[in-house]
């Protein structure tokens, strides 16, 4: 299109009146074209870099980027309009020099504003009352602080240059074409090459220096003043890696990349000075753009490893597996315990891949086994381009409100995955229920069922505060024999690994069953689907992160209210003997969930009593029993009577276990 514009005037342009203001001191056409190209390059370069740095502070939703773009475009338009009314009579060279010098200063000041971006955003958000409107308003205020003055000057400069190009043979069209060409190259030069090679601060200083270099002639006073401002900014703003870490976090390493700033931190929150903590390193976490915690070692290994083991164990004999999204790499590394499995792991951010070694020994398999291959790629494109089918595909916990992540929950993406599965393959999409509004969760489940109508739901682990649901879709629902685990798990390494993460028997694997297809269909109900042409998740999911007023267990409770899972339907006819135990296990698990929800809701006593009920339902589900023991230990000094009451009830519910009775006897001896 730029070439077509270059060939001549736009329709009707040659017939328009002469411009109101001619510039007798306008430079030659070649220099004008160079200025138009350069200012387009620098202007969009500043925008790309500004948005990239702000992404470390804002919520990174579609509204965050819309706010920045709105301010940028409105500022440019306003600057052009104001200049047409007030500055067009002042000739060409003097306004050009002034605008270029002011733009260099404005970009330098913008760099300083970016250094204070967190304070600006948090102050504005608090002043506006938070919530959805307040948060989006704060993002717009931050964008105004970063882009306001520079874009006004950019608009005025573009107006000046196009006015100088205005001729009867179509100069404005050529001006726009050349300026757009420079703008088109800016994301590659500044957002990729310079961002990767020098970092955001140096890249922004290069933008400011670029405007200085375009000044018509050397003026010692003007050049000196501009360079003094840029030097001051360079010294006063030490870094634009706006790391904002919890006081108990200790930075291990950080990388500033094209798309994100990635940090690895040690979490010393619960790491005291006792002997146990001296011998055990603190949990190590992966943090992206300050907001996204992508898992880590310590307690997080349990969840992340189960994300790999559970879907793989539900397949009879997986030979090829694909993992979409790596994070710390712990989930993908857990797949290395499955013998003869060849795995491909796909991660969008190269900076994340570069720090996976920081999570050893949990990720050691990625370095010791040639069966696990890591790819830096976009998950959607990798799925579309992959050739050989996979037996198991596992999609990680994508943050649904993050700009671009909504596309990973579309019908089209799910359908592309279905076509990539082997005939007996299965696909597991993990969902962070605590990061979703109920209506968004229903849209995702509805979209998944559109492609996998026989999908089932599975709990990754039994945490009511941060529940994680796996949607597992396959061509036809499987049924499992009572000795499934014994048949499936024969390698000692796999048996040890699965058992260490609570998946050491058929009962424990199938006991994660959460919802049958009919349960998911009843919960999701009728409504819109998330598609490429109707990306409702991208626009609705951010409401949750902006409001932050919904408890993590809300979706867990809503799904449990709609579902009545019958785990007996998972078993082959010959496995009927396991059905009563499996049913009791699921009932005890759900009772435990409800007990934890009561406690989290402030109903401590009622929740504790329900934990005792959970212990009494199934001897195979020990979590309720062990939780009550832990609570009773905490009550020993603060509320001895309550401790005795809980221990008596627990011993009555499960008398064959001796821990409650032993603790009760100790308390009675201490009278």
What is the predicted function of each stretch?
Residues 1-478, 484-487, 541, 546-548:
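Alpha-helical transmembrane segments of multi-pass membrane proteins
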Residues 566-567, 578-617:
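Alpha-helical segment of the N-proximal tetratricopeptide repeat
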Residues 604, 640-641:
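TPR-repeat structural position
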Residues 479-587:
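SAM/dcSAM-binding transferase cores
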């Amino acid at each position: 299109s730029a070439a077509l514009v270059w060939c001549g005037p736009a329709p009707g342009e040659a017939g328009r009146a002469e411009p109101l203001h001619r510039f007798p001191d306008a430079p030659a056409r070649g220099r004008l074209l160079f200025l138009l190209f350069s200012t387009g390059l620098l202007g969009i370069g500043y925008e790309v870099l500004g948005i990239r740095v702000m992404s470390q502070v804002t919520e990174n939703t579609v509204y965050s980027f819309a706010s920045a773009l709105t301010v940028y475009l409105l500022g440019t338009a306003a600057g052009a309009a104001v200049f047409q009314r007030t500055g067009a009579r002042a000739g060409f060279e003097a306004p050009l020099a002034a605008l270029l010098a002011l733009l260099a200063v404005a970009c330098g000041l913008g760099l300083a504003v970016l250094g204070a971006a967190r304070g600006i955003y948090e102050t504005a958000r608090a002043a506006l009352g938070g919530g959805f409107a307040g948060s989006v308003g704060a993002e717009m205020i931050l964008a105004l602080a970063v882009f306001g003055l520079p874009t006004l000057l950019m608009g005025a400069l573009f107006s000046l240059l196009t006015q100088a190009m205005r001729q009867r043979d179509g100069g404005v069209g050529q001006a726009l074409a050349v300026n757009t060409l420079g703008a088109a190259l800016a994301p590659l030069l500044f957002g990729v090459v310079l961002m990767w090679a020098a970092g955001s601060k140096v890249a922004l200083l290069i933008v400011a220096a670029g405007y200085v270099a375009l000044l018509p002639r050397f003026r010692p006073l003007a050049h000196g003043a501009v360079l003094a401002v840029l030097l001051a900014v360079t010294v006063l703003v030490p870094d634009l890696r706006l790391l904002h870490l919890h006081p108990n976090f200790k930075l291990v390493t950080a990388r500033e990349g094209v798309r994100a700033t990635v940090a690895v931190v040690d979490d010393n929150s619960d790491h005291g000075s006792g002997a146990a903590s001296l011998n055990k390193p603190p949990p190590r976490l992966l943090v992206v753009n300050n907001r996204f915690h992508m898992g880590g070692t310590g307690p997080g290994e349990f969840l992340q490893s189960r994300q790999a083991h559970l879907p793989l164990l539900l397949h009879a004999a997986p030979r090829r597996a694909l993992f979409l999204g790596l994070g710390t790499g712990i989930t993908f590394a857990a797949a290395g315990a499955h013998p003869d499995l060849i795995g491909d792991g796909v991660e969008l951010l190269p900076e994340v891949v570069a720090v996976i070694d920081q999570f050893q020994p949990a990720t050691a398999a990625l370095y010791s086994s040639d069966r696990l291959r890591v790819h830096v790629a976009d998950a959607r494109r990798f799925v579309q381009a992959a050739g050989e089918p996979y037996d198991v595909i596992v999609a990680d916990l994508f943050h649904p409100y993050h700009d671009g992540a909504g596309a990973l929950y579309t019908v089209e993406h799910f359908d592309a995955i279905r076509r990539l599965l082997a005939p007996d393959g299965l696909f597991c999409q993990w969902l962070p229920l605590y990061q979703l509004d109920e209506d968004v969760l229903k849209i995702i489940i509805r979209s998944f069922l559109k492609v996998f109508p026989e999908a089932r739901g599975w709990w990754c682990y039994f945490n009511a505060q941060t529940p994680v649901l796996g949607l597992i879709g396959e061509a036809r629902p499987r049924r499992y024999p009572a000795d499934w685990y014994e048949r499936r798990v024969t390698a000692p390494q796999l048996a040890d690994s699965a058992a260490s993460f609570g998946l050491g028997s058929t009962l424990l694997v199938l006991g994660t069953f959460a919802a049958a297809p009919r349960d998911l269909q009843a919960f999701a109900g009728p409504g819109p689907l998330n598609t490429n042409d109707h990306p409702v998740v991208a626009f609705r999911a951010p409401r949750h992160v902006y409001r932050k007023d919904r408890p993590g267990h809300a979706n867990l409770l809503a799904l449990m209210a709609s579902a009545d899972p019958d785990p007996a339907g998972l078993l082959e006819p010959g496995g009927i003997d396991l059905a009563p135990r499996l049913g009791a296990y699921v009932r005890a698990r759900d009772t435990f969930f409800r007990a934890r929800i009561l406690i989290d809701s402030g109903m401590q006593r009622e929740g504790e009593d329900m934990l005792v009920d959970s212990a009494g339902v199934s001897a195979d589900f020990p979590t309720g029993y062990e939780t009550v023991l832990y609570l009773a230990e905490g009550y020993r000094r603060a509320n001895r009577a309550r401790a005795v009451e809980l221990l008596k009830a627990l011993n009555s519910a499960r008398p064959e276990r001796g821990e409650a009775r032993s603790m009760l006897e100790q308390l009675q001896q201490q009278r």
